[in-house]
Structure formats: C-alpha cells, structure tokens
C-alpha cells in the first residue's frame, strides 16, 4: 500500500480516535496532513512528530492527498470532503483505516459500551511489561506513554473497537474483548436493543477460527449473547463460572486488591494476588480482561502483577489533579476528572469514589453529552445524579446535535428538584464552572468533574484560577501590586 498511498489527510485530526491513527501512520513513514477547527495539545504533538496541521476546513487542504480519512463526526458537506469527492480522492472512514493498520499485525480489539479506553490501556501496559512491545491506539492519553498511540516492534496491535456507529464490524482481530453491552448510541441501531446485541454477535464472527472472544459474564447482556458466539470464548468477571475470576476484592487507599483464579485450557493456573492502581470494582473487571489476554499470550505472572500495580492511568479516566486549596484558603479538596457520560459508567465511577474516599462529601460537576443521550437516559440520569452530596450541573454539550425540548440541563435540574433528591446548582455557561466549583468546594470534599465534552478543560482551569487567587493574596499581603 505504501508505494501507492504516501500522503494521507485527516479531517478533524485532533479527535481522540483520529490522532492515534495519524501518529502510528507518521511512525510508519507516511506523510500526514490534517485539519481541525482549533489548536490543541494533541495537534501540537502531531506537528512535532512531523504532521502538517492546518486550522479550519478548506478545499485546498486536500491538495496532494492520496487518501482522506474522516470520522463519523465529519459531515458530508465538509468542504474538504466535497473537494476530495470532486477530485476522486478516496474518502476512508476512520474505522477502515484502523482495520488497515490491524492487517499489518495481529489485532486485539476492545469493545463494549463502557470501559474500552481503560481496558485497552491495561492490555497495552501488561503486554508491554511482558516484553511484547505492542502497537496501541487508544481513545485517551496513556499516562505512562504520554500519548494515545505508539508504534511498537511486536506482533500485536491493541485498539478500541467502536460500536457507536457499528464501525467495529470493519475490524478482523485475532482477540476480542466485550466488556459490557448497554443502551447507548441507539440511533445507530434504530432504537432496537436487539439489533445492538446482534451487532456484538456479528463482531465476534469477525474472529478467525483460532481467535478468542474474551467476554465479561458479569454483564447480563454479554451473558445473553454467549450461546450465539461460535468462536472460542474466555469468560471473565466475578461470576462463579468465570474462567478468569476475581475474588476477595477490596478497596485500599484508592487502589483495589484482589485474588485472581484462572482456569484456562483445561487446567488451573496459579492464583494471582493483584494490587490494581485504580479504584472501583468496574476497574477490577477491566483488569481481568487484561489478565485473561496476557495469560493466553503467556506473559509471565510477575509482569502481569507489576504492570497492574504500577499502572499510571489514562487521561480523563478518574484522573487525579491532587489537592486544591479551598477558596477561603483554610482547607483543601481533592479534584478528580472523569470522562463518564452514560449513567451506568457514571454510577460505577461514583461508587469507586465512595470506596476510595469513604466518609467524605462528594461533589459532582457534570456536563451532559448529547441531547439524544440525555433524552434516552433521562430517568437514569436523575437517579445517578441524585446520589451525590452536591451537584453542579452544566448545560448539555451538543456534539453537533440540535436541542431537544425537555432534554437539556434545565430539564434535568427541574427533575432533580421535583424528585427531592438534591438541590442542584445549574451553571449555564461552562466557562463559569471553574469559579462555581471553587465557590462550592469545602475542606475535605472530593470534587469530580465529569462528562465527554468541554468540561474536560475545567479541572485545569480550576487549578489555574486558584493559583491566580493565591498569587493575588500574596501581593495583597505584601502591601500592593507587584511592579
């Protein structure tokens, strides 16, 4: 392919799914160009690696490209897409380009409604510790690597498989993980949950006869499709029939300690005593998927244990910003950021926070993501948002969707008040959220910012705002403004 296609252009190169593929292609020696609406740390990193980054979208950006890569977020009337079509330049969906990368190595694809990014990161970390040096493409920044993608020298590529647009059906890996199946992105499946489950069944059919489907049998919907999976299966979870099973799990100082019982290939492996450097039972399940794959690939047990104990996490997945001084300067609160945006994953993250920080007030700053999701999961959002001790609620991050009546931030605020679960503070403009957090936070609080939209910038803004306030206080104490 390389002797034909040398110049590859990405429309929306700064996106999490796009940037990782672009980085791997750069490392493979392709010339990569890309456009995005604004500059970011991601686009700046790609530029330092050799990519040509252009601001905004214009027809001339595709000049010289042999292929144009787009994600489902890119509209068909984008000027670069129209120009590529007019010039007969192939327009390649992101998932198809990922599938091409997977053809170069043996693919490990992580699917599921929740937990894909963390599980992919755990798998990549364990395989790397085991000396397999995998290539990985992740939807979040792997902190230990400082990037969301890397080209390894080993035989495997580990990547997320996206069910949101059914594009995971383009992939043909040798190992698949299904973490769970939940009602999300239902527009793709005609609001028919049976069609969503059927898509996951079809995903397992992409495996070769020697492939393995690694399935979390704690999830009732995954268990339901189990009889229809015709390829070899490894079951994992807390369930008694799991072949890779966690027992005696407990939270200790923000980590999870548990024992893993493994019954694979007809014989018992030695039990593993694991300390996972992540909180929450859901992350124990994610780690079990990584342990199952590592065991199948004969990664030494000591490497598995070491990788999980030293795992440094993923950007925006229970990412800790440390202790931040309160506005009055008389105490501190713990600041955490998380990507959770579906009620199920939000509940798991909040439960993890309760386990990691027992007896502390939990303050949630939440920005709903997409009007359609807010509409479809409205009652579940009310239920999970009502479990925190204090709530700062932002307006919905539209992600390109038009507003939907009674499915916005104000509607959620009213519903929570009617339910008498909590008295939320509605923060209409996300730019005002950092100050709202500082106004609400008390000494000893745990404050979590949560959502898949622009709220990801808020924790850094909180830290910067408080640093400015402290500097101003120092200036005042010294008797005037600094010269």
UniProtKB/Swiss-Prot annotation:
GO terms for cellular component: cytoplasm. It is an enzyme of class 6 (ligase). GO terms for molecular function: ATP binding; UDP-N-acetylmuramate-L-alanine ligase activity. GO terms for biological process: cell division; cell wall organization; peptidoglycan biosynthetic process; regulation of cell shape. Pathway: Cell wall biogenesis; peptidoglycan biosynthesis. Its main location: cytoplasm. It comes from the Bacteria. ATP binds at residues 112-118. The keyword Cell division applies. It catalyses: UDP-N-acetyl-alpha-D-muramate + L-alanine + ATP = UDP-N-acetyl-alpha-D-muramoyl-L-alanine + ADP + phosphate + H(+). Signal peptide: none annotated. InterPro entries: Mur-like_cat_sf (IPR036565), Mur_ligase_C (IPR004101), Mur_ligase_C_dom_sf (IPR036615), Mur_ligase_cen (IPR013221), Mur_ligase_N (IPR000713), MurCDEF_pg_biosynth (IPR050061), UDP-N-AcMur_Ala_ligase_MurC (IPR005758). It holds the Pfam family Mur_ligase_C. It is found in: Cytoplasm. Keywords: ATP-binding, Cell cycle, Cell division, Cell shape, Cell wall biogenesis/degradation, Cytoplasm, Ligase, Nucleotide-binding, Peptidoglycan synthesis. Its EC number is 6.3.2.8. HAMAP family: MurC. Belongs to the MurCDEF family. Cell wall formation. This is UDP-N-acetylmuramate--L-alanine ligase. It comes from Ralstonia pickettii (strain 12J). The lineage of its organism: Bacteria, Pseudomonadati, Pseudomonadota, Betaproteobacteria, Burkholderiales.
